[in-house]
Every structure is written in structure tokens, then in C-alpha cells.
Amino acid sequence: MKGLDEKSTQDRNNLLATTLNYILSKSFDLKQLCIVKGKHCWALYVDVLILESDGNTLDAAVMAARAALSSTKLPGVSVEEDTESESLELSNDPNDSKSLDCSNLPLAITLCQIDSTAYFIDPTKAEETCARAILHVAVNPSGTISFMQKSSDGTIEPSILYDMIAVAQSTASTLFSQFQ
């Protein structure tokens, strides 16, 4: 069974990486990474290392990536143009840097439905395993939903889905207010 567990872990890791990339890239103004329009730009990579998971991994990964990007500083770059080429020179001055605008980066909220009407947020791994349906919702600071995905086989009735979305938005709003 070890091979199956490893494959399952790799599948979960790939899904987490793809989902995290989608959530962040849709909420981040890539223009701020431009050095010379059409020629040079910064490439940012966010690596998330999960040491141990008791469930709700996406929410923690999005929050960690959001915190990392919010504290990222890009060094100043000067562009020196001569007749044949241009060269870029990074500033050695730590004060010559710019922060990234991460004001629109969302938070992810995971909700588990356990029966036709009952659901809750922030599930553990055991709760995720027992859930009828799992819903991941990414909400930006203005309350707009930027991503939503159901990651289970169960169905969610439309009326319950709307309630779950409202709870995700309310929870995200509370969390965003804690960051201020």
C-alpha cells in the first residue's frame, strides 16, 4: 500500500500547487513585476512545504503565501542602455527596494458539509474524510469570491451552497479585520 499512499500524496501535492497558483495569480497585479516593459520582469515562486497536515491544507497554504508575498521586497534595478544592449544592475542598498501590492490577495476558507443541512469551517483531516461535501472558497478583501471548488463526491443543495458561501465571506471578513 505504500506505493498507493505515495501516489495519493503526490496527487494531493500537485492539486494543492495548481490551486494555489490559480488563486494567487488571478488576484495579483503582475504589472508590478515589470522591470522593462516587454523585456524584463521579476519571476516570483512561492514554495510551500507541508511538514504535517491535519486537514485544511489549502487555507493554511494560501495564508502562508499571502504573508510571504506581503513581506517580499524587490530590490531596486537600474537599466543601463548602450548602443547594442541593455544591462540590469541590482541595487546594493536595502532601502532601495519596493514592496509588492498584495492588498487584493484572497484568503481561502474551507467548509465541510456533513449532512443535508449541517456544515462547518476549518475541518480536520478526519472531518474531511467523513464529509459529505467539501467546498473551498477564496475571498478577497472586498468580499468578492475569486475562486470556488468542490473537492468531494457529494452534492450540495443550492440553498445550502449560498449559505456556505455567505459563511465563507463572513469568515474571511473577520480574518481580514484581524490583519489590519
Predicted regions and their residues:
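Polyanion-binding surfaces on beta-sheet-dominated domains and ring/shell assemblies
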Residues: M1-Q180
